[in-house]
Amino acid sequence: MNATLRILAWLIAVALVALPVVAVLNGWVGAERWPLARLRVSGDFKRVPAEELRAVVLPYARSGFFAVKLQDAQDAIARLPWVESAQVRKRWPDVLEVHVVEHKPFARWGTDRMLSEQGRLFRTPPLLKDFKLPQLGGPDAKTQEVVALYNESRALFAPTGLDVERLEMDARGSWSLGLSNGVQIVIGRDDARARLQRFARVLPQLTDPQRPIARADLRYTNGFTVERRMENGESGMDKKPKPVPPAAPHALVLNSLRLRTPLLTIPHSPFAIPGFKT
């Protein structure tokens, strides 16, 4: 009996010591005695409003040094638009440190997302302004492949003074591309790079300011078709002879042309080929 009483007394003594410690560490009592008085924010970010960040962090900081839930605060910050990742730490006696990594947009992806320079997809933030970005698209697992062809396409069309504004791959793997002068190009599924090389090589010969190209279809083994804008605004198939090798109806045969890929660097293209920056 005496042994039982001794054990019970020992447990009560331990509880009396442990409960205050647990209460303090969980913020049940004394939170106001160890308040987090300072917020220290770091990171290279420009689009996350400081007021919005402060409003998200403040409720967690009020719980005090011992009771603040760092992971919950970190998750809340990461849900803000433009935030790629966040780290939250506390430093004795009263500092809450927040490090924010912001998404750096590279392109629009599909209808409602963007692709960052790190190759991550994220929702398009609301009230997006002043962003002139290329329109890319495709299966989520194909982002590297889409970006690689985008970079190569820019190099191919750079000598013509044109840029690539749109490049998309559909669910079947078929490619389409839009140039800065409004020309829409259907590439198809196979040999996309070779087909674009052929078209870019002869594009200067097809220039006609009076009848600009509206659309090109490259889904042919040895050539392509071209539709031009007519004076009435409509488009039609190009049947006018060009100083190029003999052509089948509506198709320019390119077997006899010697093709070269221009050795160019792409300005303002943050992706390395074939992968993303790390």
Curated annotation (Swiss-Prot):
Coiled coil: none annotated. The gene is ftsQ. Residues 34-103 form the POTRA domain. GO terms for cellular component: cell division site; FtsQBL complex; plasma membrane. Part of a complex composed of FtsB, FtsL and FtsQ. Keywords: Cell cycle, Cell division, Cell inner membrane, Cell membrane, Membrane, Transmembrane, Transmembrane helix. GO terms for biological process: division septum assembly; FtsZ-dependent cytokinesis. This is Cell division protein FtsQ.
